[in-house]
Amino acid sequence: LLKKKLQRLAARLLSRPASIGFHKNTEMPALLRSGDLLVHPSIADLESVSVIEGMAAGLVPVIASSPLSAAGQFALRDESLFPVDDVEALARRIDWWVDHPDELSKWGEIYAEHTKEHYSVAASVRKFVAMEREAIADNANKQINA
């Protein structure tokens, strides 16, 4: 019942069809790229993978700043954060991005590049190798000083 209600509302309000429901992993990059913003109003979120996926697709995130969520760490500017449970602040953030399409486009590219540099598989491997080398060096220093 709610799904049908949302679909009718989306058909009336949106200029392009809304995709409500579950989607295959292979469909997600294109689906994400079809959006304008990634709104992440979660109160609690430990990993925030959806935020990283959206950013990788070039979406600017609008993230709830919550002590129970890791998502806020991904915001690169104040316009990407709003206080959790503050719907008026959320609306202001969305409106800001909609009212500044050049900034939205520019920051979509910045978020995508930032995600590639810091959260891609290649970036994760580089960080892991650096951490492993540091641990080996620390262990070698402990043995020398023992």
Model-based region annotation:
Residues K4-H23:
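Nucleotide-activated donor-binding/catalytic signature segment of Leloir-type glycosyltransferases, i.e.
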Residues L76-V87, W96-P101:
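Conserved acidic donor-binding segment of nucleotide-sugar-dependent glycosyltransferases
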Residues I43:
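Aromatic "clamp/platform" in nucleotide-sugar-dependent glycosyltransferases that forms part
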Residues D102-E134, N139:
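A charged, aromatic-enriched C-terminal amphipathic alpha-helix characteristic of glycosyltransferases
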Residues L38-V39:
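A short hydrophobic beta-strand element within the catalytic core of glycosyltransferases
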Residues F22-H23, A30-G35:
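Short alpha-helical donor nucleotide-sugar binding micro-motif in glycosyltransferases
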Residues P29, E47, V51-A56, A70-G72:
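Short alpha-helical segment that forms part of, or immediately flanks, the ligand-binding pocket
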Residues V60-S65, S69:
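Short hydrophobic beta-strand element within catalytic cores of glycosyltransferases
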